[in-house]
Each structure stands twice: as C-alpha cells, then as structure tokens.
Amino acid sequence: MLTFIGLGLYDQKDISVKGLEAIREADVVYAEFYTSRLMGATLEDMQELYGKPVKVLMREDVEQHPKDTVLSDAVDKKVVFLTGGDAMVATTHVDLRLRAKKMGIETRLIHGASIQSAVCGLTGLQNYRFGKSATIAFPYKDIISETPYDTILMNKKNGLHTLLFLDIDREKGYMTVNRGIELLLKVEERRKEGAVAGALCVGIARAGSPSPCVRAGRIEELQAFDFGGPLHIMVMPADLHFLEEEALQDLAGLKLG
C-alpha cells in the first residue's frame, strides 16, 4: 500500500488529521522536498509530531530509482510518501503513482493545502481566471528559458492570469520574486513583445505562515521590493475584474494611477 500525503504549505502542523493518522499507522515513511518544502519546520519537527522516522529522498531516488526504495517497500508494507503542498500537483508524483499501479500496488491520496488555492485566497484573484502555469528556472549554462514568457503572452491574449512557480535548486537555493522578475525582463529586452515590461505583477512569500507577504505593483517596482525569506511565488495578471482590482488594493498594496 502506498499513500501519498500532502503536508500543506508552511510547517508540520499543516497536515490533516487523516494524514497524521496514516503516518502513524505506516510501516515506512518517505518524503521528498525538492519540488516544495515546509519552510517553517525542520525534519526533526516533523518526526517529533508524527512519531515516526522520515526517510528523505533525493530527485534521482524518486524519478529514476523508485523501485529501490518506495515501490519495493510498498509491495508488502504500509508506506507513506510525504510532499509539500498537495501530493499530486507535481507531475513526478503522478508518475510515481502510475508506476505503483503497474506493479499492482494499491495507492491512496490524502490531499493537503495547495499553493494554487492559497494564492487566490491571499490576493483575491479569481481562481477560474488562471490559465496555464509555468516555472521560472535558474539559467542553465547562461541560457534563460523563454517558456514562462511565452506562457504569459498566451494567457494575456486569452484574458487569463499566469501563476509562476520559482525554481528550487540544491546548489543555487530558492529563487526569489526579484530574481524571477530579472529573468523575465531579460527575455523581454530580447523579445520586445510587451508581455511583461511595465506590466502588473504580484509577488507572494511564505504563504501559509503567520506572516505572509503579498505585494502588487508594476513589475519594475517589485524588482526592488524586499519580500523576505522563502518560499516565493509570482502572478502575472491579465486585465483585472473590478473585484480583483479592489482586492489587490486592499490586500496587496496596489496603487493605481
């Protein structure tokens, strides 16, 4: 049996009662924190609350060699697999579940709070008005991916907001809103298609914590704003509904005019 459990957004206390019960009933507990992580909790904090040791897996363990760990144990044991946010938002977790199914392993999902819904709650932007999302990745060999720029351009043409995840890298750390903006503006400078220059941007930091930061303004203004510690995420809105405009003014400090 393999149970996927979403841990929520910020610390060890975000887990659901159902998720906590599943952990305490498990024979083996695995976790991965390369797609997302709980910035308000250490591994020791989690283990103390859960009452179980947690084995943390690296990307290659989950994506390349899951049969050596999670899947081999789940054949004849109760195994739980912990992730930040909601367990099935990351494609790699869907792949792991499908591999388990092919091996005849029963799977179960216990959902957790997701950053997608948290962004709507913190900003007042309407959930149904979001289009395709994208990830701003750290440059590879000085090459900046233009996929986020293309996604923003396409969504804006359709009147849709764009949620932009910010990269997490074992060596480079956590990308900030400021760095994400810098990379988008570099693509804008080269492409000059008007997707981001002078555009409205919303930055969010530490969603789910006692002190989240939410700030809206022109993208060039936010580049200099201090959002504080991670994790960060961004939204590039399309034209706003009047209620969204009011929400960003009241909740995110948007100044019009």
From Swiss-Prot:
InterPro entries reported for this sequence: 4pyrrol_Mease, 4pyrrol_Methylase_sf, 4pyrrole_Mease_sub1, 4pyrrole_Mease_sub2, Dphthn_synthase
Keywords: Methyltransferase, S-adenosyl-L-methionine, Transferase
Presence of the UniProt keyword Cell wall biogenesis/degradation in the record: no
Ligand binding (S-adenosyl-L-methionine): 9, 86, 89, 114-115, 166, 207, 232
Family: Belongs to the diphthine synthase family.
Function: S-adenosyl-L-methionine-dependent methyltransferase that catalyzes the trimethylation of the amino group of the modified target histidine residue in translation elongation factor 2 (EF-2), to form an intermediate called diphthine. The three successive methylation reactions represent the second step of diphthamide biosynthesis.
Protein name (record): Diphthine synthase
